[in-house]
């Protein structure tokens, strides 16, 4: 099985020189790293007689070239200034293995500009194995007597920058003689002082938060309230869903009723209903008039057809026909004065009413050919009623009125 790994080696003398130079300046510093890269293949044989080959690339940082001001060989966009870089490197271009930068009171994270500059340096120097050394010193005490230096070696792999193990040696390459390094977070003295001042109000002596029990109780109460509200919301949603179903069902019923009413209206317009009461009345009172029997009238006074109706509707003339109202005279309900009645009788005598009465009786008693039978008796009885209501001129107390149609 074959694998690859990268290891950075930095001597204590070079690291001390870099730190001394940085602490004697008032701003951040940067520069180029010189050295060499070695590749070593290690073959290990396991108990299963299988060979495992591992290639280890060792980047040995031996020297450095400091730049006494920022942006000395690049601009603010991370683009490399070829003329300035060539002037700085002169004859040591082939021994460049990377570049470094000191940042005060900062975290161990590469900025976007540093990433762009690193890729441009790889392209310009034709060295894909170029590394970047980032050193971030910070002050850990208020008296500024203790300093902390964190360092890291970065190399791009698969488009991302990963930390490479860095060994700081003292007198040689032996691991037992190397400096022991420990990564610490960069903390501000002002932040530490503020936390130390107010920590007693929020933390116990063992570092645990105060009022944790009350916070947990409040959290449990909020959860219970939330469960109750969720149940109410679920119930209301079900009620709303039920109401929506009822509304949709009523809408469907309404649509069906409207469709039925529309169909009935169209049917009534196409086949209007005949006014059978009018037809029966015309046959009863005008049996010989063919002009009145020659058309059929609807309930809306419209002509249905111009052919006569020959159907017997079997309606009782007195009880069913609404066009005839039987008149009943009541002397107690409406008494009439004697003088007007006598005057009316005199006028009737002068107008020869008795001479006209036999002619009226003769026309009323003459039955038509279509209504001989059952209607003959009704017509004769009707004429007798009219005759009775008309009466004689000698009757002074009972004067009839004309029949109402």
Curated annotation (Swiss-Prot):
Residues the record lists as Phosphoserine modifications: 48, 382-383, 392, 402
Processing and modification events after translation: Phosphorylation of Ser-402 of the pSXXF motif by ATM or ATR constitutes a specific recognition motif for the BRCT domain of BRCA1.
GO terms classed as biological process: attachment of spindle microtubules to kinetochore; chromatin organization; double-strand break repair; mitotic G2 DNA damage checkpoint signaling; mitotic spindle assembly; positive regulation of DNA repair; response to ionizing radiation
GO MF: microtubule binding; polyubiquitin modification-dependent protein binding
Superkingdom of source: Eukaryota
Entry keyword annotation includes Phosphoprotein: yes
Keywords: Chromatin regulator, Coiled coil, DNA damage, DNA repair, Nucleus, Phosphoprotein
Motif (pSXXF motif): 402-405
Coiled coil regions in record: 208-262
Domain (MPN) ranges: 7-154
Chief place where the protein resides: nucleus
Function: Involved in DNA damage response and double-strand break (DSB) repair. Component of the BRCA1-A complex, acting as a central scaffold protein that assembles the various components of the complex and mediates the recruitment of BRCA1. The BRCA1-A complex specifically recognizes 'Lys-63'-linked ubiquitinated histones H2A and H2AX at DNA lesion sites, leading to target the BRCA1-BARD1 heterodimer to sites of DNA damage at DSBs. This complex also possesses deubiquitinase activity that specifically removes 'Lys-63'-linked ubiquitin on histones H2A and H2AX.
Protein name: BRCA1-A complex subunit Abraxas 1
Organism name: Rattus norvegicus
